[in-house]
Amino acid sequence: MGTARFLRAVLLLSVLLMVTFPALLSAEHHDGRVDICRLPSDSGDCLRFFEMWCFDGTTCTKFVYGGYGGNDNRFPTEKACMKRCAKA
């Protein structure tokens, strides 16, 4: 029973890494810096409810942030998101 749970956890972790790692790679600049506007939205690890804004590749969209974790593609207002991520 314990082995099955362990294997399930390893499989889940592997799938999460396969999904997340390419997204992080595509968010890198040529000099290795991460472009936060290309990161996927991430609600974080907690269950609190904060309305935040993230850039989805074309525009800023509202999402719910849990209050801990996540990534830097998170802004308190649509204006702050557009100022940082909208390309002129």
Swiss-Prot record:
Organism superkingdom: Eukaryota
The keyword Cell membrane belongs to this UniProt entry's keyword annotation: no
Marked site positions, May bind Kv1: L39
GO biological process annotation, one example: envenomation resulting in negative regulation of voltage-gated potassium channel activity in another organism
CDD domains hit by this protein: Kunitz_huwentoxin
Disulfide bonds: C37-C85, C60-C81
Keyword Disulfide bond applies: yes
Residue numbers marked as site, Reactive bond for chymotrypsin: L47, R48
Residues in the signal sequence: 1-27
Locations listed in the record: Secreted
Domain BPTI/Kunitz inhibitor: 37-85
Function: Serine protease inhibitor that inhibits trypsin at a molar ratio of 1:1.
PANTHER family assigned to the protein according to its UniProt record, in alphabetical order: KUNITZ-TYPE PROTEASE INHIBITOR-RELATED, TISSUE FACTOR PATHWAY INHIBITOR
Protein name: Kunitz-type U15-theraphotoxin-Hhn1k
Species classification: Eukaryota, Metazoa, Ecdysozoa, Arthropoda, Chelicerata
